[in-house]
Amino acid sequence: MSDAPKVPELSEIASRTLGHYDANAVRFWEGTRDHDVTQNYEALLGALGNAAPLRLLDFGCGPGRDLVALSALGHTLTGLDGSAEFVRMAREHSGCTVLEQSFFDLDLGEAAFDGVFANASLFHVPRAQLPRVLAELFASLVPGGVLFCSNPRSFDVDREGFNGERYGSYLTTQGWLGAIALAGFVVEQQYFRPTGLPAAQQPWLALVARKPV
């Protein structure tokens, strides 16, 4: 018999996590709108040759900070979030098309995007669901398209569960690399954030991965 903790139902994970974000949307916006993630933008756009306009999906767009920034660079952005309040705010802030979709019930289409920007979002997917979600992101990209993702990492073993009302999968660096590769992506770049700190103080793992041509 396994002693591993039981993973909650997807309905509970979604309702509690999205409920938290809906209830704290304004506070979240105020606390994150000035975060400098230019390094992450440059990682995605550089991998795509910095050509504009690119068709980009902001997966887990929140209130729209990155939609605004990437649109201002001349790209065509589509946002996606499961939080109704985040979707409302993102549409208002960016003027972009923003899809209200659960990560567990995606409808993205085939080869619809040149790049996917998944900044601090994929870790909300339970480990058992990651292969399916990553496969859908893979299918949504054109051949040669690029996935950028940034997620908190575990320094010892893969773990998952609720942190307050938000569910998270905290994988090791190798855990994230394995999940991305299993979906068919080829990882081309990895780095840790925040920059300029010792590795033990860099909890965020950023990956740039390409869909083969």
What are these regions (language model features)?
Residues 131-143:
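A short glycine-rich, Lys/Arg-flanked "PGG" loop and its adjoining helix->strand segment in the class I
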Residues 57, 63-105:
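Class I SAM-dependent methyltransferase SAM/SAH-binding core
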Residues 159-175:
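Acceptor-substrate binding/catalytic loop of class I
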Residues 196-213:
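Core SAM-dependent methyltransferase catalytic element
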Residues 104-116:
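A short acidic, Gly/Pro-enriched loop at the edge of an enzyme's catalytic core
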Residues 144-151:
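Conserved beta-strand signature within the Rossmann-like core of class I S-adenosyl-L-methionine
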Residues 2-51, 155:
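Conserved class I S-adenosyl-L-methionine
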Residues 185-196:
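Conserved S-adenosyl-L-methionine
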